[in-house]
Amino acid sequence: MAPPRRRLAALVGLVAVVVIGGGLLAVTRPWVPKTCAATAATAHPEWSVARRWNEALLDAIRRALPAPTVHTRNLFHTSAAMWDAWAVYDPKASGYFVHDKLTASDVASARNEAISYAAYRVLTARYIKSVGADESLSEFDDVMDSLCYPIDVTTADGSTPAAVGNRIAKAVLDYGLADGSNQAGGYADPDYKPVNPPLVVNKPGTTMIDPNRWQPLQLEHMISQNGIPIVNGVQQAIGPQWGHVKSFAIPDGGTDGVPIDPGPPPRLGDAATDQAYKDQAVEVIRDSSQLDPTSGVEIDISPGVRGANTLGTNDGHGHPTNPVTGQPYAPDLVNSGDFGRALTEFWADGPKSETPPGHWNVIANTVSDELSPNLRIGGAGPAVDRLEWDVKLYLALNGANHDAAIAAWGLKGHYDSVRPISMIRYMGGLGQSSDPALPSYDREGLPLVPDLVELITKETTAPGQRHAALAGHEGEIAVRAWSGNPKDPKTETGGVHWILAIDWVPYQVPTFVTPSFPGYASGHSTFSRASAEVLTGFTGSEYFPGGIDEWTTKAGALKVEKGPTKDVTLQWATYYDAADLAGLSRLYGGIHIPADDFTGRTIGSACGKAAWERAQQYFSGQARS
């Protein structure tokens, strides 16, 4: 990282901001290093130059506001720019934005330089106005300095590697101004207005005009998942127009902005899906009820008993043996309440808040490190060098994630579907829908489920009875669920208790609660399955290296509340297993229903397969833009 003086100079002394055709942004420091001693290999000598830029981009994502759509687009456009800079010097490969073909006496050096200028220009332009721009731009400058590439070389004319990289960046940035994202308008959709008034989280219940449509939340103190304060306490929808963004491999979204349409989610009041709507809200309550670390329930979460699901289901029973070792997977016994909480927090936005697509870049980089140096694209053929592996992997992976964002947000924008907090509070406020003969009947109320969703009565609120703490609320609906955020999350837990349905909240920090966009389909599920498909195709195996991957959440490391009580090691055998758990985590976290998750997995699979097939056409020179 640049010293503070240099970071300040990088912002205060911006002496040249040049826009060429709406695209090429050149930012130069007011100082020039007297000497250049390459330091690229000091920390990670095994990293390719493409990996260095990918890591710098992930750092920028961690600092910025967590908008998955925008960051995924940046990941893809940067990956495509690096691919083009590599492909220029390959006689066969097809470029994505630029189709130049050049030769060089030192192809490896030319590629490194062209890739760096392309990535630097794109990233500087995309993150100059973001939160954390000071640090991010300084890091981008530092990468260039460490590689001995002067950042004041801005020409896009000619055949030098720097000019090639600048020319590619210009093409990328010009393209981005007309790709349907409304970059010039801050990626906003000026035509979108929520149907429902805001749900005030710290007040009971909710008022909804349409219980099937998205409802923004109003929070007293709103902070993004990576800790950035947000001034307006009412959520603004992120990316309703994203289904109209130009894709990598999936079809155009058409006038509706829906590239892949599996049909609508369950709807309250719809003859065919009313019961599914209610049942899936109950499923979220059930998952919430399992977040109790004092329950004493211990479960096995090893790949030997979990995973191997059919696409779009949780019907798997695990893998009989590890195909690498030939041995059964060892049991992995954990506290049930610890599992749900650790799973939710791990998959929230990645361990360092790089958003789901960024998290899958982290996973992919780790896989690459473990496979190196035996890097065979598709799991067969000759081993390739790390740069070729990385630029091809990033093109396929982030092309898939870009399309996953378009597909998922196309459905979010088109169906504008409700989130669980609104569903549960709305139905719970109306009453129960199970028995017209019982009090508080409403056909749009919550179904009664023994020991989970119950009608509060004088008998159940009597001293010592299960609803005693809810005395005075007879006739209302109680749910057994996570009771909310404790005052001190480092030393206390909210616990699982009987609470009023109108007070239900998801297992999230109180300054976030639920993402700022509709539920259907789950972005986590779509991104994760798309990434799993690419990693399976690219590595030639659905299994992680060694047949297993894992993450340990240390005792006491949770952020929402105290816990876990002991170390929890999450495990998965295949990329698909990991992706399914990412989707499932959103139910434990209370921000998606099963329809959001399963549909996301299905359309994510389509995105990933299409991207892998399309990427191979670019590799072989058979792509047609």
Identify the function of each model-found stretch.
Residues 2-29:
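Secretory targeting and sorting signals
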